[in-house]
């Protein structure tokens, strides 16, 4: 830094002032790169304003209709990626935090829910952590929770919704496969058509492709797999049977539970075959009862997964709200400094 005394007049009358010394090259470099406090605050305001905008966009996607399409999922994923980028900028710019803000963010983001689904344990956070490290930790954990937790549930609900809609389409055809028997005490059922439709749906969702995989979420052009441990963790979290675990190449994926559909086919095989199988009322009622029980199992699974998705969405939303409050407070502090 400059030696101010070297540029001042002599403090004693009658004594010639000391000749100014030429600053060294390193001193010139220091003068050139150190921004003023005002410039630093101005940079903070820009970074904080951009982050605040991205947070609002992310919050808007969280409040939208639950994702049931690839387009909706892509929109939410993009909003989370942009939020992460803006948080990375805060980490690099070194936006300062108050002691209370530092502690609040550290305690909120040091143990994210995504750690529950990680094969390796999280390192315990240090007691003291710098503001830049806090922003970096927040950025990494927001990204991890968004992609590895909420993002998984978005994909699970989207795939299962498509699956259940396909099953509902089969149910809509049932009226055409049922007809009264000859004496009014029997019912004719087109077993072959019903069984063929259900078998086709089973075949579709037991194939491993981007449209049938629940976990891991599929993005990009290639197909992504996970380790066996990760896949098993998600099977447990989703409360699905072990049969949903499938090997794919060198990794594993989790598929839809087609067990209820297989039970339907088995029950149809048990009553016979044909395009107009005649059943007495008792036999038909017994078959219908079993069929509806499996239909209810499918519906319950979708409802359970949708509720789990809602919980994940709320968790992420709460974290974003904490982050939004901190950024808004920091932004106001930076603006007040410049106005003062």
Curated annotation (Swiss-Prot):
Residues 291-319 form a coiled coil. The keyword Transcription does not apply. One of its GO terms (cellular component) is extracellular region. Residues 1-26, 57-76 are annotated as: Disordered. Induction: Transcriptionally regulated by SicA and InvF. Also regulated by InvE. It holds the Pfam family T3SS_TC. It is found in: Secreted. SUPFAM superfamilies: IpaD-like (SSF140693). Keywords: Coiled coil, Secreted, Virulence. The N-terminal domain is an intra-molecular chaperone that prevents premature oligomerization of the residues on the coiled-coil region that are involved in interactions with the needle and/or itself. The residues in the C-terminal domain probably form oligomeric structures at the tip of the needle that are responsible for the regulation of secretion of other effectors. Belongs to the invasin protein D family. Required for translocation of effector proteins via the type III secretion system SPI-1, which is essential for an efficient bacterial internalization. Probably acts by modulating the secretion of SipA, SipB, and SipC. This is Cell invasion protein SipD. It comes from Salmonella paratyphi A (strain ATCC 9150 / SARB42).
């Amino acid at each position: 830094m400059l030696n101010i005394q070297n540029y001042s007049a002599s403090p004693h009358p009658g004594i010639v002032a000391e000749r100014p010394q030429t600053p060294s090259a390193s001193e010139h470099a220091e003068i050139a790169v150190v921004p003023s406090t005002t410039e630093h605050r101005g940079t903070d305001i820009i970074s904080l304003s951009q982050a605040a905008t991205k947070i609002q966009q992310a919050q808007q996607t969280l409040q939208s209709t639950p994702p049931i399409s690839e387009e909706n999922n892509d929109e939410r994923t993009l909003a989370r990626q942009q939020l992460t980028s803006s948080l990375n900028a805060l980490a690099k710019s070194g936006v300062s935090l108050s002691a209370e803000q530092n502690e609040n963010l550290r305690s909120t983001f040091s143990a994210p829910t995504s750690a529950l689904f990680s094969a390796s344990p999280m390192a315990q956070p240090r007691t003291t952590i710098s503001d830049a490290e806090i922003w970096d930790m927040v950025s990494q954990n927001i990204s991890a929770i968004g992609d590895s937790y909420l993002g998984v549930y978005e994909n699970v609900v989207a795939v299962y919704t498509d699956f259940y809609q396909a099953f509902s389409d089969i149910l809509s055809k049932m009226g055409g496969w049922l007809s009264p028997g000859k004496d009014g005490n029997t019912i004719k059922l087109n077993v072959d058509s019903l069984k063929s439709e259900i078998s086709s749906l089973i075949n579709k969702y037991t194939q491993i492709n981007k449209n049938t995989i629940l976990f891991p979420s599929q993005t990009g052009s290639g197909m992504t797999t996970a380790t066996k441990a990760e896949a098993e963790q998600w099977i447990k979290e989703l409360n699905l049977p072990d049969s949903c675990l499938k090997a794919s190449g060198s990794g594993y994926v989790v598929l839809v539970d087609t067990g209820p559909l297989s039970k339907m086919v088995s029950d149809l095989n048990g009553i016979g075959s044909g395009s107009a199988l005649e059943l007495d009322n008792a036999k038909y009622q017994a078959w219908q009862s079993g069929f509806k029980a499996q239909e209810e199992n499918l519906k319950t699974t979708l409802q359970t997964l949708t509720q789990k998705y809602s919980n994940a969405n709320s968790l992420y939303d709460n974290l974003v709200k904490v982050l939004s409050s901190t950024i808004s407070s920091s932004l106001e502090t930076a603006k007040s400094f410049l106005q003062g």
